[in-house]
Amino acid sequence: MTSMKYLCSLLLFLVIYTSNSQSRTIPVDTLVKTTHNTTVKGQSFSYTAETGTQPVWDKNGDPMATLFYTYYTRNNVKDSANRPLIISFNGGPGSASVWMHVAYTGPRILNIDEEGYPVQPYGFRNNPNSIIDVADIVFVNPVNTGYSRMIPDKENKMPEKELFFGINADIKYLTEWVNTFVSRHNRWESPKYIIGESYGGTRVMGLANELQSSQWM
């Protein structure tokens, strides 16, 4: 009897869990900001961390995917129009921008030793070699990496995978996404640099050409 009660309780939990899981929605267009302090090369200053999702639109102007990003800006910059903007990607091509973010250029990095192994206490620490002192940085997660996903249309149909997966498709939708990001954050006057690791190198070469030729950036 006890086993039967346990089994019934477990089945009820699974039904509730499954029901809740099916009702979850992917955030399409969100924004959260926090303020922090750091020290880079002996200079202490504050910066703003912005995380969010930003859509990729189809030809009808409806969102067909949403990309998660993390955007860091240094506060109290006098000449913000001329401050460089770094757009950063990892490779794979199925990798989120996590390693460029928390192991290379971001203001916070994993607590690791000089060989790259984690050390106690596990966690994060300020990155004394971050480039946030001289440039603002946005770390972008392409579709199906990190929290970035394709999203269904009004008829609950998913977009064609060919719109996102492939060398040219990858470059095309990311070019449009970057254009939207730059416009939303008023960074058209800023010098822009795109960096990538591994396959990210191939990606950013294509992006640089496409942004110049199709977006006049």
Residue locations for each model-derived region?
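Active-site catalytic microenvironments for nucleophilic, acid-base chemistry
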Residues: N75, T180, E210-S214
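Glycine-rich nucleophile elbow surrounding the catalytic serine of serine-hydrolase chemistry
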Residues: Y147, G196-N209
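A catalytic-pocket lid/entrance helix-loop region that shapes and gates access to the active site
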Residues: G106-I112, T202, A208-M217
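Alpha/beta-hydrolase fold nucleophile elbow
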Residues: N186-Y199
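Phosphate/oxyanion-binding active-site loops and adjacent basic polyanion-contact surfaces
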Residues: N60-T66, E162-T175, Y199-M205
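Catalytic-loop region of hydrolases
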Residues: S21-L85, A103
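N-terminal cap/lid subdomain of alpha/beta-hydrolase-fold enzymes
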Residues: G61-L163
